[in-house]
Amino acid sequence: KCRRENLDRLIDGMYDEVEEKRDGLIIIGRCNKEALKKLNKKYKSVVSVNRNSTNYEVDEVLCDGKKIAAAAVEYLISLGHKNIGYIGQCHSEDRYNGYLETLKKHDLDVIPEYVIETKQTEAEGYEAMEKFFQSDDMPTGIYCANDISAIGMLKCLNKFRNRYYMPSIISSDDIQEAQFTRPMLTTVSLPKEDMGKFALYLLLDRLKGGHSGIVRMELEGRLMIRNSCSSVEDSMWSDYCI
């Protein structure tokens, strides 16, 4: 209730009650259903750009989080990994659900100790890697839901240079820094530029009367194979360096 009231005050405070609807709004990233409904009343055209669907609350350009996670986990499995961990958000998160579904598809166990819920920060990725170091049972492959946290994990590995445990790490987003980590980060690239272009197209098309129903446009991610993943047999050897 408190969150809902705070949301009401925040959105109402942004706009005059008697003000006519504004033209358009593009929302990048996660936005809860209540906020979407309120913003949809304030604008003539609202478009969401995200990895998690709005369930047809507004027009959306989507790179499906489940498919992103599936591509990442499938790649780890193709390298022989069976003990696969997850780092990232879990609640209402399509990438986490994609991780779970892909393990189930291959009859692989979901081990609770291999799942560490984190926010999207380098520091929390670093801390997650430290937790694995302290465990007696560690995954050989790890899917990290975002590049930023994965970079934190790689920095932790580089600092300790543990030559007896070097998991394969794969993530998603393909931010610029992913090409300059040591080792270079394997990730699933999102077509960010195209997502932005199509979001603008949908926004303008609705304003011009080109469509009235809710439109969902889905784009595919692309696996970017670099150096942070290797076969399961190599999980105990270190090529990590500062």
Regions picked out by a protein language model, each given a short descriptive name:
Residues G29-R30, N146:
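N-terminal glycine-rich "phosphate-gripper" loop used for MgATP/nucleotide binding
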Residues K1-C2, D8-G24, A35-I242:
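Bacterial carbohydrate/catabolite-sensing allosteric modules
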